[in-house]
Amino acid sequence: MLKRFVRYSLFLALGLLVLGCQSTKPMMYASKKITGLKTPESVVQAKDGRIFISEINAFGQDGDGRISVVDQHGNVSIFADNLDDPKGLAIIGEYLYVADKTKILKINPNGQVSVFVSAEAFPHVPFFLNDLEADLQGNLYVSDSGDLFNTGKGGAIYKITPNGEVKLLIKDTQDTRVIAPNGLLADDTGNHLIYVDFSSGVLYSLNTSTSTLSDLADGFGGGDGVVHHSSGVMYVSDWKNGKVYSVNMMGDLSLVKGGYQAAADIAITKDERYLLVPDMKAGELDFIALDGVKP
């Protein structure tokens, strides 16, 4: 259950954020599942309706990662390639930002890639940069899931200013609940950051000023992505168990859809009609209709 002393204010702030971002642009392609992707991890939609998908391809194989784009008719093409292990995506203005292993990339509208934040710009060289989130002030937030495959240590969350300065918000040595931070969701003020932990499956709220954590909900297995609907409903994906859950304003968890091989970093379309779910192991992008969503 959501902790009621933080739930109301956080959902109110998130509701204001999403209401300001809605679009009525029709989704001509939305019923068409995208197949044939190479280890899709994250997805984000631009204001013009295009959908960008990060494709890792082979983990640890540098240079074989790419970003694909789906146009308004459902046609898929390569937007940028020769990446390493691209994961989280965020859009600020006309630029696409990508969390790629230990660095943050910036891609212009023509698909030209540059390094926005190098590994050396972080207080500590990251282990496994994962999700990426932007706030309304133009800041980026990135999760470092830590040394997932060995020690299980090193989890952290960072804030990146518009000019590329990096600030540590929280790390595992500050709070033992920080294990493998993954999916991120910022409110409209930048004062709170909701995130789900991949190892514990717990959903948290992080106060970005005080670096204090509040438990919101649990039971998400291998928590991967988290998004918010203007009705007040949040959606969380469980990578390990191939499921997507909803959490309503009362704190009730419901299974939205299961059967995925690995439900990765989800997104909501600008018109809020569909939930976008990359199935990493299946190589697909699924569209879940959100008709009749209630708070």
Which residues does each PLM region occupy?
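Beta-rich, blade/repeat-based domains predominating
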Residues: G36-D48, S54, G63-D64, A80-K101, ...
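A short loop-to-beta-strand structural motif that recurs across blades of beta-propeller domains
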Residues: D64-S68, K103-L105, G155-Y158, V202-Y204, ...
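A short beta-strand motif characteristic of beta-propeller blades
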Residues: M28-I34, G74-A80, V113-P123, E165-T176, ...
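C-terminal motif of bacterial Sec signal peptides marking the signal peptidase cleavage site
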Residues: V18-G20
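Short loop/turn segments that connect beta-strands within beta-propeller blades
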Residues: V70-G74, I107-Q112, I160-E165, N207-S211, ...
